[in-house]
Amino acid sequence: MSFRSVLLTALLSLSFTTTMQAAHHHYHRYTDKLHRQNHKKDLISPKPTEQEACNTSSLSKELIPLSEQRGLLSPICDFISERPCLHGVSVRNLKQALKNSAGTQIALDWSILPQWFNPRVSHAPKLSIRDFGYSAHQTVTEATPPCWQNCFNPSAAVTIYDSSYGKGVFQISYTLVRYWRENAATAGDAMMLAGSINDYPSRQNIFSQFTFSQNFPNERVSLTIGQYSLYAIDGTLYNNDQQLGFISYALSQNPTATYSSGSLGAYLQVAPTASTSLQIGFQDAYNISGSSIKWSNLTKNRYNFHGFASWAPRCCLGSGQYSVLLYVTRQVPEQMEQTMGWSVNASQHISSKLYVFGRYSGVTGHVFPINRTYSFGMASANLFNRNPQDLFGIACAFNNVHLSASPNTKRKYETVIEGFATIGCGPYLSFAPDFQLYLYPALRPNKQSARVYSVRANLAI
């Protein structure tokens, strides 16, 4: 055995046996949402320890070890002993008691989003890929603003056990989207855009998270099985959640993504150091929409694969995260083309009040009109120390439009500039006026711009 192999083995053994002193923050959409909603500034709870304060990404470290509980009814007895209604009925007290007694965290996000847009009438049809090469009767799409979106997203995480053998965490998240009057898809057709004016352009039901995770001792390795989506890790703090940050399709998610909104599978995650994280996994290729959990698809032997690497350094300026996602999707009836995609995300706190981010993503094939995107922006949270929900953001996305993806595409590029200001009203309610400016709509050569005005009302409990 060579000296190099012995040295490498020793270093790996040392890294896996050393307890992580302060795990750095790696972005996860639903875990972050749970942490944010269960750590409001005005929660009546003991002050967190120094270890809890520096480890914001670990749910289990903030919960009472369930290995100390005895009996099936222990969580109920502990919940009663917490006496959450001693000083009156309060949502925050109930959630805190539920977390302390049963190791459960709950987040409920409900938003109402009216959007006004201009222009309102198209001048040419927006044909589907099936119409390519055929002479279709040209129709005019007309939409009457505003379009009202109602989005409800409940999430929960339950620590089932916490012992010397590791921790078991069950996590669930569901998204329900409904529209009144026009929907965003019709508005986008009328404006003749390649990208939508929000993250959910039509009525949707998405089972985005239904997983069980086994975190092994020292939290270096974890194995997750169940239904999940890569949207949870593909992004940064404010460009991956329409209910919190930017609203437009190109700035609220990866607009080139061809992976599933939620599908059954498994992934293995390894943290070689406190600031790095590696992930590899697979999913059923048939469930594209994630509207339900389809167990029978696992026997059809078609799977999507992904690899993910994240680095979350801490410097004198503040914390940051830099990640790369690679994925391959198979050809299935719901998506008639095999694709390979990538997404590179970078974010950095310049100070406690300034956060900058960027994304470069792309995909092969012609599944969606947008096949490349470059975006960057900045955000400032609680700039005036008035309310923790206060947030100001501005960003820009340059979208490369594939000419063969839609027969009506007239331009190769479409640019969106967006700015918003979230104003917190108490610990749970917020309002966010938002403005989107589209330069050179890809499907409308006779217009140089299109505009969208929005006011998002969000209740986060």
Curated annotation (Swiss-Prot):
Signal peptide boundaries: 1-22
GO molecular function: porin activity
UniProt keyword annotations, A-Z: Amino-acid transport, Cell outer membrane, Ion transport, Membrane, Porin, Signal, Transmembrane, Transmembrane beta strand, Transport, Virulence
GO biological process, one term: monoatomic ion transport
Membrane topology, record value: Multi-pass membrane protein
Pfam (any one): OprB
Main localization category: membrane
One GO cellular component term noted in the UniProt record for this chain: cell outer membrane
InterPro entries noted in UniProt: Carb-sel_porin_OprB, OprB_sf
Compartment(s) of residence: Cell outer membrane
Main function: Facilitates L-arginine uptake, as part of the AaxABC system. The arginine uptake by the bacterium in the macrophage may be a virulence factor against the host innate immune response.
UniProt similarity note: Belongs to the OprB family.
Protein name (record): Porin AaxA
Gene that produces this protein: aaxA
